[in-house]
C-alpha cells in the first residue's frame, strides 16, 4: 500500500459549472495551508480564496477537509471545489503540486486507497466505476446496491457458512474417538446442501447482474428464409442486413448492439441452418453454431407459413437437441401477417412462443418487452446488484469445489478432502470481495477507473 499523497481532478475534463481537485494523504493539510492559508474545519464547507504562493488569487470556491480515517480513502482528504474551466483547474493543480511530496494520482487510485484501508471491499470499489458507466436506470440502481454492500453481504454470508462448516468438519477429523460419527450423522450433509442451494441463488442473481452491466447476447437462428435478417433490422430499427427472397442470402454473422430502455443488447444474425454443398455457406453455418454455443438466449425463428407447430421439439427436434444445456430458447413464429394467427404470447414445452411479422412490425414490441424482462428490466427498479465476469467465474469455481466436496463426503466419507474443498471454496469466494486477491488483478481492476476516482 502506498503512503504517497496523491492529487487529481475529480470532475470530468472540459468545461463545466464546477470543477473539483482532490488530494489524499498525509500532506493534505500541508496543501490546505499552502493554498488556503488555513486548514478548514473537518467536514465543514469553507468558502475561501485559492491562492498562489505570492498571494495572488487563482480562484474562489469551497474547500472541504476530511480527517482520516473518516474519509472516502481512509486518509486525510482535501477537496477544492472551484469553477469548472479547464484552464483554472490546471492552474490549481499546478499550484497544489508545488507542495513537496505530492504526485498525480493514477486512474482509480483514490478508490484503490479506500479498498486498501478497508473503507470498501473490492465489489464496492468496482461498483463505483459501474455506477459511473451505467447506461440505464436499472444498471445505475443495481450498481448503487452493490456499492451499498448488497452483493458483498451475500458473499460474506456464504464465506461465513463455509468457514463454520469447515471448522465443524475439521473438528470431526481431529476428535475421531467421539461417540457420534460427525461425518455420517447427517448434519454436515444438510449444511453442505444448504450452502450449495444458497450459492445457486447468488449465482443466478450475479448472472442477471452481469447481463444488466454487460448486456445479453441474443442469437437469431433458424432455417433459411425464416425472416432472421428482417427481425435483426426490426430490432435494430435500421436496415443492417440485406433481405431477399433468395435462401442463404446471409452467409456470415451480422452483429448489432442496441439499447432497450438503456439496457444493452447484442443481437447476432446468423446464416440459415441447413445441409449444403456450398463451401462458403458451410463456413457461415459453422460460425452460426459457434455463436449459438456462447449465446445467453436463442431466438428460434420459424416461418409460420411452413408449419402450424409451436413446440420447438416438434418443429425441428434435431436443432433443439443440438443446443447447449440450459440455453434459453424463445420461439418466434414469423409472418403472422400472412398466416393471420393471433399475436398471443404462449408457453409451449417450457419455451415462450411469440407471433410476429418482422416485415410489418406486428408483435415486435412485445418481443422487445420479453427481451427486456430477460435482461432483468424492472420498472420499479427495486433489488438486484451489479456483477462482472470475474465474479461469475469465482462463483462457478466455488460451486465446483462444493460439489467435489459433496462427492468426497457422500461417496468416500473423506473428511480431509471435504475440508480441503471447503477451503478452496472459501478462497474463491473471498477473491470476489478482495480478501484473497493477487496484486495483478487489483492493478487491472483499478486501472480501468477514471482518474480522480
From Swiss-Prot:
Gene3D superfamilies: P-loop containing nucleotide triphosphate hydrolases, Probable tRNA modification gtpase trme, domain 1, tRNA modification GTPase MnmE domain 2. GO terms for molecular function: GTP binding; GTPase activity; metal ion binding. PROSITE patterns: G_TRME (PS51709). Binds 1 potassium ion per subunit. One of its GO terms (biological process) is tRNA wobble uridine modification. This is tRNA modification GTPase MnmE. Homodimer. Heterotetramer of two MnmE and two MnmG subunits. The lineage of its organism: Bacteria, Pseudomonadati, Pseudomonadota, Gammaproteobacteria, Alteromonadales. K(+) binds at residues 225, 244, 246, 249. The gene is mnmE.
